[in-house]
């Protein structure tokens, strides 16, 4: 006890630094972070095991079906790990006629498809050509407006120059007139004797007339004023095109390329149908159990991944919250240490002043050593009376029995007794701290494990808790399987056919620069549009003639004879917008283009899954459901006990 410090021998910066590594805060928040991410690790591992177990369960019952068209034999086999009882198996012989094409319907469907494709292309190309032609016309309007403005500016400058010449001549004549007037005045002042008639005649002869300039240059002034006040514009002119004039693509219906594509598609359909179904088919069928799981592997993985990401976001959010709380508590401790440091300095200064006043001594260290033991004993006996008295009795017994053999081991033993008695008698705050830690860790783990895996879509025909449905390979199964292969093949052929039409035929034949028929039609349509545009533009100028009065400006037609060739040279048909596919094309051929002449069945097969197998599968699912909750409960209990034991040891070590 002689090593107890009455005053902390640390400076204020050292105290601030020690607040960052305060044992209680560091242990508390470190254990919380470990609990958060430890729980996440347990959840992650458990979900991985569940996913692995689910994959195994999905693979427990499987069915393999194969249909051989070469030998016209369909075989189905099944394997299952469940106990099978009361399973009956029979074999059936099927004789089926071959599938055939409804060629009339297929030809009409192809023609309708191509007709709708051409109409769609005509509409798209017509709209696009009108938009591009209007844009071309707007560009020409902008250029023409710029030329008009430039011409008006040029004429304005020329008229200003002429008026400047007018002003120069006028000023010169005005100067000469003033000079003549001054000369006449001087002559009059010299008292020349002239009769009145002679004076009038001389005055009229000496007068300089400049009124003629008003009539000569007046027109220029008025024209300049008109040009300066001109506000006419042609950019607000809008073209109205004839929408009834569009390209006609009917000539493509008789092209050799299209007829060849049509023949190839029909031949490919016939070959595919002939391969998938022969003229006579003998099928040997055996019963099989087909599993329909509640969940597919991809859906399970996506759901478990979503739950894992949700828990991971919770862990990150909790980590950020407790990290902020840790630094907030550190700042609070620093503020408390600052206040305590000031109070201690005041108390030390007060004690030193009192000691100096009583003894005249200034050596505070000497008095600290003298009074240290007494003050420490008084402090312990006041704050912890019961442990102090018990420790005192234990030490007295040790000194009485073997005072000469007292060593460090016995001293440590006495301190250990002291710590135990202190925990029992005065450790209420320790137990409160432990209870608080237990409560916080419990809440953290509970919130992290409080989630629900959403139910996945089921494949069942009626409501029920069963996980597996049985399905028997009967005549309908065999027919459905063969038709499934045929539908898949027909869909692929139709898709390839439409891609070939879009990417090869349409792209190769829709070109204004290379196809003479399209070029002639486009030229005729553009001639009509050019004439209509020029007529509308002339009408527009006549209606807005008040803006053009007073200026001598000749506006030519908007579009010239070379506009058509210029537009055709820069316009390309939008083939990228007409390469869409029609999904109903394949569906119509699958539904009405394939003829099934019938199937004759001589026997059927039945299979059943035993009740014991169903119970085993159900029990396995229930165990899988409660497995996660059991892991969480025992894991939470183990974590809480470890935390409590850990904190007790830490406090014991700190008080030694």
Swiss-Prot record:
Main localization (coarse): membrane
- Location in or out of the cell: Membrane
GO CC, sorted alphabetically, is: membrane
What is its induction behaviour? By pheromone.
- The domain of life is Eukaryota
In Gene Ontology terms, what is a biological process of this protein?
A: karyogamy involved in conjugation with cellular fusion
Q: Any transmembrane segments, and where?
A: 16-36, 320-340, 422-442, 634-654
State the UniProt keywords alphabetically: Membrane, Transmembrane, Transmembrane helix
Membrane topology according to the record: Multi-pass membrane protein
Provide the protein name: Pheromone-regulated membrane protein 2
Gene label: PRM2
């Amino acid at each position: 006890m002689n090593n107890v410090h009455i005053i902390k021998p640390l400076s204020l910066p050292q105290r601030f630094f020690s607040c960052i590594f305060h044992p209680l805060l560091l242990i508390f928040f470190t254990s919380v972070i470990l609990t958060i991410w430890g729980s996440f690790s347990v959840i992650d591992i458990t979900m991985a095991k569940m996913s692995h177990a689910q994959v195994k369960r999905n693979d427990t019952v499987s069915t393999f079906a194969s249909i051989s068209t070469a030998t016209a034999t369909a075989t189905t086999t099944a394997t299952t790990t469940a106990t099978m009882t009361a399973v009956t198996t029979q074999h059936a012989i099927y004789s089926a006629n071959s599938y055939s094409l409804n060629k009339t319907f297929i030809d009409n469907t192809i023609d309708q498809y191509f007709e709708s494709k051409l109409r769609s292309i005509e509409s798209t190309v017509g709209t696009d050509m009108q938009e591009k032609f209007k844009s071309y016309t707007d560009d020409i309007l902008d250029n023409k407006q710029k030329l008009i403005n430039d011409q008006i500016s040029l004429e304005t400058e020329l008229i200003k120059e002429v008026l400047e010449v007018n002003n120069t001549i006028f000023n010169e004549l005005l100067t000469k007139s003033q000079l003549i007037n001054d000369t006449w005045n001087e002559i009059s002042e010299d008292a020349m004797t002239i009769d009145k008639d002679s004076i009038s005649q001389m005055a009229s002869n000496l007068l300089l007339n400049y009124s003629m300039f008003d009539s000569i240059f007046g027109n220029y002034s008025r024209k300049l004023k008109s040009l300066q006040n001109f506000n006419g514009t042609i950019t607000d002119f809008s073209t109205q095109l004839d929408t009834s004039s569009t390209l006609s693509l009917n000539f493509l219906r008789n092209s050799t390329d299209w007829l060849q594509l049509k023949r190839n598609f029909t031949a490919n359909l016939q070959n595919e149908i002939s391969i998938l179904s022969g003229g006579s088919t003998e099928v040997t069928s055996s019963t099989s159990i087909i599993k329909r799981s509640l969940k597919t592997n991809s859906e399970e993985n996506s759901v478990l991944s979503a739950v894992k990401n949700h828990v991971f976001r919770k862990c990150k959010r909790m980590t950020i919250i407790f990290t902020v709380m840790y630094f907030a508590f550190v700042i609070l401790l620093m503020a408390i240490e600052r206040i305590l440091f000031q109070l201690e300095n005041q108390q030390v200064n007060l004690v030193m002043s009192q000691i100096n006043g009583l003894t005249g001594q200034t050596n505070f260290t000497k008095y600290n050593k003298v009074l240290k033991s007494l003050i420490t004993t008084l402090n312990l006996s006041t704050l912890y009376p019961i442990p102090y008295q018990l420790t005192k009795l234990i030490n007295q017994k040790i000194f009485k029995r073997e005072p000469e053999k007292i060593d460090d081991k016995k001293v440590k033993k006495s301190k250990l007794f002291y710590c135990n008695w202190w925990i029992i008698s005065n450790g209420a705050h320790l137990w409160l701290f432990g209870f608080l830690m237990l409560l916080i860790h419990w809440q953290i783990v509970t919130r992290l494990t409080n989630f629900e895996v959403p139910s996945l879509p089921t494949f069942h025909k009626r409501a029920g808790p069963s996980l597996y449905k049985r399905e028997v390979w009967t005549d309908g199964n065999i027919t459905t399987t063969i038709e499934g292969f045929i539908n898949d093949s027909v869909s692929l052929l139709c898709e390839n056919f439409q891609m070939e039409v879009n990417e090869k035929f349409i792209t190769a034949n829709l070109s204004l620069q290379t196809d003479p028929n399209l070029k002639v039609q486009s030229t005729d349509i553009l001639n009509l549009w050019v004439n209509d545009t020029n007529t509308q533009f002339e009408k527009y100028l006549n209606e807005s003639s008040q803006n053009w009065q007073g200026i001598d400006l000749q506006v030519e037609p908007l579009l010239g004879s070379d506009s058509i060739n210029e537009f055709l040279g820069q316009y390309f048909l939008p083939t990228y917008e007409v390469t869409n596919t029609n999904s109903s094309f394949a569906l119509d051929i699958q539904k009405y283009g394939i003829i099934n002449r019938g199937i004759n069945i001589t026997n059927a097969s039945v299979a059943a899954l035993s009740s014991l197998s169903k119970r085993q599968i159900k029990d396995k699912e229930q165990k899988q459901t409660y497995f996660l909750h059991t892991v969480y409960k025992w894991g939470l209990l183990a974590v809480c006990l470890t935390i409590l034991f850990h904190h007790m040891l830490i406090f014991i070590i700190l008080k030694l």
